[in-house]
């Protein structure tokens, strides 16, 4: 399997893009070299994100703070809060970059997770292909939010920026407008690509581990027709060892993705709230480009909350299904030592497997529903206050 098929096929292109945008190590070995190339690879992320990403986000927040009223602040808050979640994601992946790189390397190369037969290969390729194309579409839709907003303002009579931020010079004239517009477009492109690729990375870790739990279920099911107790016992022991290692991977994954999921869920209710508030003040006739961009933005934000909740829920569901798979084995015809082994495994399975965000709550579909309800409550309160 490893010689001609890639176990992380769906992430190969995404990781290359993340390297170009300073979000993923080129390699741990090359960055440790005390050469000019090693220095550039170590510090490239700072050279890219300090003058653009962090400066741009700071100017957005400055624009929100100096706004004269709630309506003007709402035009920038929906995006500046989104970018605040991005800051947490970037700092988190920089902090855990070595651990994340080693986790990805283990998922790709560790012999413990090799696929054994063509059925497993077909299953793996099918799921990887679906993940890849789904997230390619998600990335294109997210970039569409940026470029529909950037295009829409070009058809307005006056000078208007697609995404408001504080500009330290007079920009509402023909000569200087394009400087402000260009920095706006560059900043939004960089932050958008950074945001969606980091989302994809976090979701991929969750997705890959859920696939490993599904793989365990498939292998337990295959033991149903085994008649030889010796082979059956060997297969069970291999499954138990693999399960223990997957649990260890789950904890590593939780440590890496927990900060970004926590920040995303906490801030998402406010983001959707201010996005809905802005939609109330953007007319489709007056500014159709901005209106369509806002609709896309709200849909992407809902998807951005839903995806980690969905994949976190998948881990819990497929880990819990292993109990049912044990009952489907040929345990009634096994010798007493094998039954004792299965009983010990069943006791091990009683401990639930969940991904927790900062040890506050389990990442799953219930927290997604609560976040949407909170966003609606905040929006209703904001509309009442503004009226």
Curated annotation (Swiss-Prot):
Odorant receptor which mediates acceptance or avoidance behavior, depending on its substrates. The odorant receptor repertoire encodes a large collection of odor stimuli that vary widely in identity, intensity, and duration. May form a complex with Orco to form odorant-sensing units, providing sensitive and prolonged odorant signaling and calcium permeability. Residues 1-45, 97-133, 213-255, 312-362 are cytoplasmic. Disulfide bonds: none annotated. This is Odorant receptor 94a. Interacts with Orco. Complexes exist early in the endomembrane system in olfactory sensory neurons (OSNs), coupling these complexes to the conserved ciliary trafficking pathway. InterPro entries: 7tm6_olfct_rcpt. The chain crosses the membrane at residues 46-66, 76-96, 134-154, 192-212, 256-276, 291-311, 363-383. PANTHER family: ODORANT RECEPTOR, ODORANT RECEPTOR 46A, ISOFORM B-RELATED. It holds the Pfam family 7tm_6. One of its GO terms (molecular function) is olfactory receptor activity. The atypical heteromeric and topological design of the odorant receptors appears to be an insect-specific solution for odor recognition, making the OR/Orco complex an attractive target for the development of highly selective insect repellents to disrupt olfactory-mediated host-seeking behaviors of insect disease vectors. Odor-evoked OR currents are independent of known G-protein-coupled second messenger pathways. Glycans are attached at residue 384. Residues 67-75, 155-191, 277-290, 384-387 are extracellular. Belongs to the insect chemoreceptor superfamily. Heteromeric odorant receptor channel (TC 1.A.69) family. Or2a subfamily. It is a multi-pass membrane protein. Its main location: membrane. It is found in: Cell membrane. The keyword Transmembrane applies. GO terms for cellular component: cation channel complex; dendrite membrane; plasma membrane. Keywords: Cell membrane, Glycoprotein, Membrane, Olfaction, Receptor, Sensory transduction, Transducer, Transmembrane, Transmembrane helix. One of its GO terms (biological process) is detection of chemical stimulus involved in sensory perception of smell.
């Amino acid at each position: 399997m490893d010689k001609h098929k890639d176990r992380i096929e769906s992430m190969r292109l995404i990781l290359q893009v993340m390297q170009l945008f300073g979000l993923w190590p080129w390699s741990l070995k090359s960055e440790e070299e005390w050469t000019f190339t090693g220095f550039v690879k170590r510090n490239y992320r700072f050279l890219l994100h300090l003058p653009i990403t962090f400066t741009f986000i700071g100017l957005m927040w400055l624009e929100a703070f100096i706004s004269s009223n709630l309506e003007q602040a709402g035009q920038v808050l929906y995006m500046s809060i989104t970018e605040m979640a991005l800051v947490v994601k970037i700092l988190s992946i920089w902090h855990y970059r070595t651990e994340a790189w080693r986790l990805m390397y283990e998922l790709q190369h560790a012999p413990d997770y090799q696929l054994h037969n063509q059925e497993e290969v077909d299953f793996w390729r099918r799921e990887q292909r679906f993940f890849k194309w789904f997230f390619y579409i998600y990335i294109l839709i997210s970039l569409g939010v940026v470029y529909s907003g950037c295009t829409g303002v070009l058809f307005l009579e006056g000078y208007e920026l697609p995404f408001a931020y504080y500009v330290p010079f007079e920009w509402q004239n023909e000569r200087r407008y394009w400087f402000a517009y260009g920095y706006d477009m560059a900043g939004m492109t960089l932050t958008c690509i950074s945001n969606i690729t980091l989302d994809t990375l976090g979701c991929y870790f969750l997705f890959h581990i859920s696939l490993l739990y599904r793989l365990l279920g498939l292998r337990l099911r295959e033991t149903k027709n085994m008649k030889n107790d010796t082979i059956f016992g060997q297969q069970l022991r291999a499954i138990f060892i693999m399960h223990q290692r997957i649990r260890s991977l789950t904890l590593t994954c939780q440590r890496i993705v927990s900060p970004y999921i926590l920040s995303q869920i906490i801030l998402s209710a406010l983001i959707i709230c201010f996005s809905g508030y802005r939609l109330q003040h953007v007319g489709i006739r007056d500014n159709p480009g901005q209106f369509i961009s806002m609709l896309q933005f709200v849909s992407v934000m809902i998807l951005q909350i839903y995806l980690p909740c969905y994949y976190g829920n998948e881990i819990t569901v497929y880990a819990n299904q292993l109990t049912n798979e044990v009952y489907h084995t040929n345990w009634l015809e096994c010798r007493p030592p094998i039954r004792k082994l299965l009983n010990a495994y069943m006791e091990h399975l009683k401990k639930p497997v969940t991904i927790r965000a900062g040890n506050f709550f389990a990442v799953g579909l219930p927290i997604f529903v609560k976040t949407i309800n909170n966003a609606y409550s905040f929006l209703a309160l904001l509309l009442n206050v503004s009226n």
